[in-house]
Amino acid sequence: MPHTGSQHTLQATPKTAQHTGAQKAPEQAIALKKEQQLKNQEGATSHRKAHTEGCHTQKTRMSADKAGLRHRQGSGEVRARTASTRVEGECSSDGVVMMFCMPARGEEEKASGEARGEDVGSSRESRQGTAHKSTCMHTEAASLQKAGEIGKVEDAKT
């Protein structure tokens, strides 16, 4: 009888040890996961900052280009199209995609009229906010600020 008892104790010890080990492992994994998330956030922030700066330079270049010609830089080109805006982007050698917007067909005619320059600018910025919602944070604030003006532009069109 005492022999079986000692056997039980011996068997129980490694089981308990394994169990505690299994409990500790997820805590370490969670800590590592949190560290990784922080690193990812930092990376995303710096990427967004780089993207924002690139986006501003592209935007300036596009507004200066009345003819609506596309500027190509970098190794590749990225394109997307929504109902109101043609979005184009450049993929630089390090793989960061720089996006910029061009007005869709109907808007190109309106953009050529310089008399309504400010109105055209504000409505174009709002479209940029829509097109870039997932990638470009700085345009959202601009589109929200100009929301009042955009409403007037929409009324003026109809």
Curated annotation (Swiss-Prot):
Top-level lineage group: Eukaryota
Bias (Polar residues) ranges: 1-21, 128-137
Sequence ranges of Basic and acidic residues compositional bias: 51-68, 107-127, 149-158
Ranges where the record places region Disordered: 1-89, 107-158
Protein name (Swiss-Prot/TrEMBL): Uncharacterized protein ECU01_0010/ECU01_1600/ECU04_0010
